[in-house]
Amino acid sequence: MASFEEKIAAAEKRAQEAAKQVKQLKAKRDMVEARKLQSLLKGQRSDDTRRKILVGALVLDMMERDESTRQRFMDRLDKYLTRADDRALFQLPIPEEK
């Protein structure tokens, strides 16, 4: 028959193994939740990009159809865009560096 010390040691070993398993399961759960969040954020970014493309297409169409609308947008872009490559895309003058 096993002594009390052996029973205690066996119980402690089982408790350690259970704690290890709990830790592994929590890590697995956290990974699954992180993947879900990443997937959700990717979908939101995709939707945001799609919205920007569609709005941009509408604006470009409006600019092509009406000269006064085009000029208003160009005036706004001139004030809004600061990067040289962005300004060049719309054939806006690139300000000289100070």
UniProtKB/Swiss-Prot annotation:
Question: Which keywords does this chain's UniProt record carry?
Answer: Conjugation, Mobility protein, Plasmid
Function summary: This protein is essential to promote the specific transfer of the plasmid in the presence of conjugative plasmids.
Q: Under which name does UniProt file this protein? A: Mobilization protein MobS
